[in-house]
Amino acid sequence: MCGIVGFTAPGQDPAAAKQIVQGMADLIRHRGPDGEGCYADGTAALGHRRLSVIDLAGGGQPMLNEDGTLVVVFNGEIYNYKTLRARLQQRGHKFATDSDTEVLLHGYEEWGRDLPCRLRGMFAFAVWDRKRGTLFCARDLFGIKPLCYYKKGETLLFASEIKAFLAHPAFEKRLNEARLPDWLSMEYLPDAETLFTGVYELPPAHTLTWQAGRVTLARYAAPRFRAKRGRSLRAWAREIGDAVAESADAHRIADVEVGCFLSGGVDSSLITCEMARRQPAVQCFSVGYAEEAYSELPAARAAAQALGVPLTETTVTADDFFAANRAIQWYLDEPMPNPAEVPLYFLCKAARQRVKVVLSGEGADELFGGYPLYRQAVWAERWQKMPRAVRRALAALLPGCGLLRRGALPRWQRSARANYVFETTQERDKYLKRDYCAPTPAQRCKPYFDAVRGLDEPTAVQWVDWQTWLPRDILRKADRMSMAHSLELRVPFLDRQVLAAAQALPRRYRCTGRRGKIALRAAAARRLPPQLADAPKRGFPVPLADWLRQEKYYALVKAKLTGPAAERFFDTGALCALLDAHRAGKTNAMTKLWAFYCFIEWYEVYFTGKIPPDL
């Protein structure tokens, strides 16, 4: 795992370009403290920060091919690189290292732009082709590894993290304020835009090609649900269990020790179980709070005992939680008010003291139907099939029922993620100082739903999550919080082979109106004790709502909500009224308050403070 940066600027001075790209790489040093390198010529410059995990002595980057016509920088891991290496050797390619990076170089020579289709892994890479004058970039199928870009004239900037652009003189740092309403509603932007004007994320499963100042994006894979009928749950459980086991084994590849995150839930327990079969006494890590009602530690302890693995525990206090948020917003690049990022930050910090790589359970809910959102979609679909007269009668009888309200809307407007923080745009807009006249968040999500009109509702919601929520929230959080501590986090559920099983799974084995992850839990039951296979989903629960009612943290948050940054964007009187109502127990406004707090803290870090900040 590493950090990559680079840019194109035809006619540039190579020596000056080398200094600039070095400065860009320095801003993401946390992604790779083990080594650095840069390359520059009259058109392109590439930089790299290395976290050495495979081929510790070799594998330095940027890496050039034999005649120096190709230069590559790469972030991630290619789990089938040995298979690809053998195939390339059969075709006459000569290798100088044992690294997966060199496989990308020779793979590009052999297969060109079809290379990403052959890769099994998590990756973001860039290949500068001096002969053709093209820069070719690619991002993995799920968006596990980040890649962002910025174009100004003929100059293209790319990097693992947006903050690297701050070191380039062509970058104009401006807030993409028009998208603030969307962000407040969803806690992320569902498309490729970011909260920095002109900065975009390369979408998952896409390539980017720069040539002569022009940029072209192309999708190289499009995962689709194609259910296979006529198989029993037992057969599916066997296939899914085998796919997850094989993926966990593939994800072990490393020349350093690999550990596991263990929460006590079914996802992390299954991954840990497969690791422990091959690596007895695998180091496991969990995080929790002193407030036991919110802590995962008791469940993690029970799981560790059942699996026979050692567990390192980390406890986060309220002081820890608030003190770390400024650093967390810096590492995230864009504001993220998901409270789960804070315990994850401390969990990664603790794990890095013992191992360099961990396996984690992200992606299981999205692939196998684990979220309550999908079960709600089952009920919404049933509601739509009821006779209109029955629906009207029930709606009149239960006027306050959110499911019935949403059930009357078109599918794309029913998406709960579009109204995650605020029930309506009117409720949200009363806190904003100006009218942004923007499309609603649901309208932003409509193209994704339009692309899967033929799917049943819960399956369509899952697919939209794959394109939006998964890369823009779950995986961004996982990447940035682990890389903040130079820790490589791998996600065995997000694997091509596991995906093949998941997208063929009939809906009734993913979720019903009452249960989720049906086939995955059946697969887990073949390997885990019943209390782990049937463990309820917990996520990272936090006692933040309680803390916001305590004088110390109430005062801290109020100071932020009435400061100069808050005054610029928000009605601070309305914010204080919301905080007071929460403190008095009249409402639970934790999600809203934390969203405002995190945006303000992020804005202060990136737009009013020095770069890089003192952390």
Predicted regions, residues:
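Cysteine-centered catalytic environments shared across enzyme families
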Residues: M1-L332, L344, C348, R526, ...
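Active-site adenylate/phosphate-handling loop in enzymes that bind or generate adenylated species
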Residues: L141, F346-L404, W469, I474, ...
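Acceptor-substrate binding/catalytic loop of class I
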Residues: E334-N338
